[in-house]
């Protein structure tokens, strides 16, 4: 079954939604964005989170020392690097599960995967000057038939109306959603429920 990651949690209500709906992963964004969260705030929220749900820290070009400190303070399960990080940068996090985001415009962008040795790749939409959470999709067909020796996580503009089609085309390990389950900038329980039900209903 395809796994689900809900990204950009920042309120107690978001944690309550997650505890009820049981996504496989939840993401906390530590990069500058409208979903950015402070470490102390994340610590409080994680203390309320069902222990079965894995935690992902999302970073964009964060200094190594800062990212390590946050990861250790919060005991994060996964570190997701969503910026211009290099393999040399990623080598500082050998004790962690690491996902590297690759921003896709066309098939040529897939060549970037050859630069990295990571646990998974997150494929997201390439949008100028933005790093994720844009609500924009890319042409999923560029991923069709692609063979990688690590799992694929599909992101970029997913919502309850297109996630089934996306999964059929890409067959990812997991799908990653943020803006697609929000209303007016906040996580929406009904959209979350519908999204997760659609993913888990696929056979």
UniProtKB/Swiss-Prot annotation:
An annotated GO BP: L-tryptophan biosynthetic process
Recorded metabolic or biological pathway in which this protein acts: Amino-acid biosynthesis; L-tryptophan biosynthesis; L-tryptophan from chorismate: step 3/5
Cross-referenced SUPFAM superfamilies: Ribulose-phoshate binding barrel
Enzyme Commission number(s) of this protein: 5.3.1.24
GO molecular function: phosphoribosylanthranilate isomerase activity
Domain of life where this protein originates: Bacteria
Keywords of the record: Amino-acid biosynthesis, Aromatic amino acid biosynthesis, Isomerase, Tryptophan biosynthesis
InterPro entries: Aldolase_TIM, PRAI_dom, RibuloseP-bd_barrel, TrpF_fam
EC class (word): isomerase
Catalysed conversion reaction: N-(5-phospho-beta-D-ribosyl)anthranilate = 1-(2-carboxyphenylamino)-1-deoxy-D-ribulose 5-phosphate
Protein family: Belongs to the TrpF family.
Official protein name in the record: N-(5'-phosphoribosyl)anthranilate isomerase
Organism of derivation: Thermoanaerobacter pseudethanolicus (strain ATCC 33223 / 39E) (Clostridium thermohydrosulfuricum)
Annotated gene: trpF
């Amino acid at each position: 079954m395809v796994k689900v990651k809900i990204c950009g949690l920042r309120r107690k209500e978001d944690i309550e939604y997650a505890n009820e709906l049981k996504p496989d992963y939840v993401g906390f964004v530590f990069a500058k964005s409208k979903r950015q969260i402070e470490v102390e705030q994340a610590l409080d929220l994680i203390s309320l989170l069902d222990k079965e749900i894995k935690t992902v820290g999302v970073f964009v070009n964060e200094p190594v020392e800062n990212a390590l400190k946050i990861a250790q303070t919060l005991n994060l399960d996964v570190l997701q690097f969503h910026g211009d990080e290099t393999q040399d940068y990623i080598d500082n996090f050998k004790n962690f599960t690491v996902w590297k985001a690759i921003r896709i415009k066309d098939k040529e962008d897939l060549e970037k995967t050859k630069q990295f040795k990571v646990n998974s790749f997150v494929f997201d939409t390439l949008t100028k000057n933005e790093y994720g959470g844009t609500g924009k999709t890319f042409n999923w067909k560029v991923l069709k038939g692609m063979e990688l020796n690590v799992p694929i996580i599909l992101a970029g503009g997913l919502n309850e109306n297109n996630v089934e089609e996306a999964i059929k085309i890409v067959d990812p390990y997991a799908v990653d959603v943020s803006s697609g389950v929000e209303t007016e900038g906040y996580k929406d329980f009904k959209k979350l429920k519908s999204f997760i039900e659609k993913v888990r209903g696929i056979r």
